[in-house]
Amino acid sequence: MSHGLPTAARLICVCALGALLLAPAANADLRVGAADDHPKSSPEVAARFYDAMKDVGMTENRITLLWDSAHPTTITGQENLAAAIRAADADGVRVTLDIYPSKAKALTESRVAPGRFAAFAAEVARTFPTVKDFIIGNEPNKSRFWQPQFNANRSRAACSAYEPVLAASYDALKSVDKSITVVGVGLGPRGTDNPLAPGNLSISPVRCIHDIGLTYRRSKRTKPIMDALSYHPYPNASTDKLDAGYAWPNAGIPDLARIKQAVWDAFHGTGQPTFEEAGMPNGPARTLKLRLNEVGWQVSIPPANRSAYFGKESVVTTDEGTQAAVYGNLIPILACDPSVESVLFFNLVDEANLDRWQSGLMRADWTKRPSYSIVKGAIAAGQTRCTGRRVAWRHDYRPVGVHLNFLGGSRRRSDRNKFWSFVAGSEEGTRYTAGLYRARRPGRVAPTLRALIARSLRTVRMRGAVLRSRGKLVGGWDKVIQFPTKRLKPGYYVYGATVVAEMNAARKATYVGRPFAVVRR
């Protein structure tokens, strides 16, 4: 059966994905690779696997290594892992080892477990001295890999508990070799933040980063805990387009600025570097890199290849042509983000169990999908080097995407009216304090009144406000902000509101509308 590339996959359109593209082209090439454990199977499989990687032009493979808390010093499958690393070294493939516990509760059951885990990571580094990249943990924001996600009082637990594990592992690995790159988190792209969610206890990536940063600050640590951040920007569904993304506080490939902002909110002004910023002095404080260590769009299996698989598909899939177009598009996009070091496709070769992952460039029978030739062509064409304008990210000082639809201007309201409200929204979670104030005249609000409103909104009593309201805005959703019912005397009034970012109280802004008239009817 032919598996030719459909027209949709041939017409590759590189989208901006909402990023700000201003600065000159980047210098460093994007590393493209795979996140695949196939090389551990046998030397023969490893040789075949790395031959395919070299043919595509891939240069990095992430391999997982599970830590068994019952045997804390044992490197499980050491012989096969050593063979896989030797084969990679011989073929010039960079190996990244991802070390995480085999049991979700392994690092929280015992006070000594984090120290034992860090010691294990150091021993692995000594055992495999050619490996210079280590990821600590895997998706601690998901209950499949870390438990508990929440405390008994329903507060978030997982990411706060993860921070000391990362810190201890950082110190242990650096004691072996200072040139080792310690990669943090391996963060999943979505979470419910709901301690009562049936079957899906998870924490969103933005809130996970916040909790890691809060624990770091409370520890009074002055050293970094990671040299790079590992992120897994899977789509919400494999039928999503590349530019679909997520609503805050989750994040996909189009939302990487959200992750960078979360890191800045969590760590700015500490010993942990944040991401490079356009137009800023990018010294030691802004050297953190982003590694997209798992990316994949799952596809349906052609009938001709179905015999290589078993089980039943458990998710909605896309077609192979669409997958190829997505994979081809994302390489030049990510190449123009100076913070992104690498993108690894999960997997290079499909898992045979249909209840697992089928997002590879090759099917389980090792036949090539259209995405294989598309990715190979993109790398050969030099699309791993930015040829356009690179992403010029800078952190926000204010809440992101705030909009308020105040009543004002020429609109008049009757003095018989008792209902007062306006519509507000923001792109991230925020808290608001809003008030309705008397104004002397229509038109532009005088600076003195604007300053008075701003001061009032910063106080608990909101002195001078005729009506008051407080609450939260959910990121990505508009809300009708309602005030207590009350009839107002004829005159001029104006709305004011202060909005504060949920993740960083220092990011706040005050907004004042235009005066409107209340007239006697």
Feature-to-residue mapping (PLM):
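Aromatic-rich peripheral "rim/lid" segments of glycoside hydrolase catalytic domains that contact
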Residues: E44, P72, P140, R144-F145, ...
